């Protein structure tokens, strides 16, 4: 009887163990099937957040791709405003802007100047840069007219001598307010050249021969102007020093590169750091950089700005009609050579002859279309920064095809 009970206990225990194994196996299979029936976890790809600058770049790229080649080439011209047909020239060449000189202000009232500039802007499809040289002292295109300012602006040197840095800042503010009130959005200043020769070409226009003083002057002018949304132009890269006037012929500079690094370059670095959007390149030949071409026509000089200075703003020429350039290339070829070496804006007085030459050079591949696109993008960005051009509200103007009445025509 004890043996039977013992066997029964063993058998019951075995059955219990077998049942437990069966249940555990079934649960494992169900769990496995359940896992197989569940969809695999999906990795959610978060959309890449683009910066405002990247978004704007894409908008500009699209805008430029929709422009005609003729429109793009026109944007590269910063033209001396002609005596006649100034309004017609705006739409005929789709120019990037006008530079005004003393003759555009002489004897005019403020309202007359404002009306003139408004007529140019009203004709432009893409709003214009309207520039002027209002340095103070010997270069005062606007304030030399007593209808526009009671007295001309003093030179930077005299301004500082009269009132120190507060006076320099106030002077920059007053210039910005006056120019903007007329419709001018770019002042071709400050002068970054440093000269110690009182008989030198740039002496009266230069602020100081001391690097620290010149740097502070450039910073004050650029930052003050930028706060008002007045464009500035750092000039004349790479620095005239004590050289002669290139309006009357080519000037040669034999200084060592180290001298430029230690002196002349520094105000331009300061201007870039302070937010300047444009640099004007001079016509002097600087042998340590390029002994063959004037700086404005030198690929090597432009490479210094792009690669060493890391400057990605607008590079513009000095006036291509100056003797230093016309003696070197001839009038028609100057703009083509200037564009090929990397200038974005071509400052000229004869757009009617220069524009067709540049357009043809792009059409035949002498100047790449990609380079033109890059230049136009820099120009449009500058216009955006000045509040002149708004890509989000831009609407292309529809030009009238109706024939205009001709004075003296028969009815």
PLM regions with names:
Residues 3-15:
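Bacterial N-terminal signal peptides that target proteins for export
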Residues 23-26:
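C-terminal motif of bacterial Sec signal peptides marking the signal peptidase cleavage site
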Residues 28-29, 35-130, 134-144, 410-411:
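N-terminal hydrophobic targeting/anchoring segments and the immediately downstream early-domain regions
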Residues 74-75, 96, 125-130, 184-185, ...:
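Short, well-ordered coil/turn segments that N-cap beta-strands
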Residues 88-214, 236, 241-254, 282-297, ...:
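Enzymes and membrane/adaptor proteins characterized by extended Gly/Ser/Thr/Asp/Glu-rich
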Residues 217-236, 259, 263-276:
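Phosphate/pyrophosphate-binding betaalpha-module
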Residues 278-281, 285-290, 304-411:
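Active-site or pore-adjacent capping/gating segments
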């Amino acid at each position: 009887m004890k043996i039977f009970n013992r066997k029964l206990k063993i058998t019951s225990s075995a059955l219990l163990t077998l049942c437990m194994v069966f249940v555990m196996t079934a649960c494992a299979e169900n769990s496995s099937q359940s896992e197989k029936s569940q969809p695999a976890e999906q990795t959610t790809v978060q959309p890449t957040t683009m910066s405002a600058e990247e978004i704007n770049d894409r908008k500009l790229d699209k805008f430029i791709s929709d422009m005609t080649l003729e429109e793009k080439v026109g944007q590269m011209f910063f033209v001396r405003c002609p005596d006649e047909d100034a309004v017609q020239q705006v739409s005929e060449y789709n120019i990037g802007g006008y530079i005004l000189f003393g003759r555009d202000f002489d004897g005019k009232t403020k309202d007359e100047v404002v009306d003139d500039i408004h007529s140019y802007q009203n004709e432009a499809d893409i709003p214009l840069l309207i520039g002027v040289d209002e340095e103070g002292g010997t270069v005062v295109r606007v304030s030399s007219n007593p209808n526009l300012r009671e007295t001309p602006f003093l030179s930077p040197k005299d301004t500082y001598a009269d009132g120190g840095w507060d006076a320099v800042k106030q002077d920059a503010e007053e210039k910005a307010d006056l120019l903007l009130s007329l419709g001018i959005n770019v002042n071709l200043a400050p002068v970054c050249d440093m000269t110690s020769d009182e008989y030198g070409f740039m002496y009266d226009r230069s602020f100081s021969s001391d690097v620290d003083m010149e740097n502070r002057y450039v910073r004050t002018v650029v930052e003050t102007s930028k706060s008002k949304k007045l464009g500035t132009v750092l000039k004349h890269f790479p620095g005239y020093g004590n050289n002669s006037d290139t309006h009357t012929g080519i000037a040669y500079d034999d200084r060592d590169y180290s001298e430029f690094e230690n002196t002349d370059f520094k105000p331009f670095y300061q201007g870039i750091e302070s937010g300047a959007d444009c640099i004007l390149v001079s016509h002097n030949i600087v042998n340590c950089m390029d002994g063959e071409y004037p700086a404005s026509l030198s690929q090597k000089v432009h490479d210094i700005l792009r690669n060493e200075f890391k400057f990605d703003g607008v590079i513009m020429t000095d006036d291509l009609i100056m003797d230093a350039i016309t003696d070197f290339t001839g009038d028609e070829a100057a703009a083509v050579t200037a564009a090929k070496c990397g200038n974005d804006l071509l400052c000229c007085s004869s757009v009617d002859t220069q524009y067709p030459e540049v357009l043809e050079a792009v059409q035949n591949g002498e100047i790449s279309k990609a380079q033109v696109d890059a230049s136009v993008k820099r120009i449009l960005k500058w216009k955006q920064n000045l509040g002149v051009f708004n890509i989000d509200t831009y609407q292309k103007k529809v030009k009238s095809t109706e024939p205009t009445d001709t004075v003296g025509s028969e009815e």
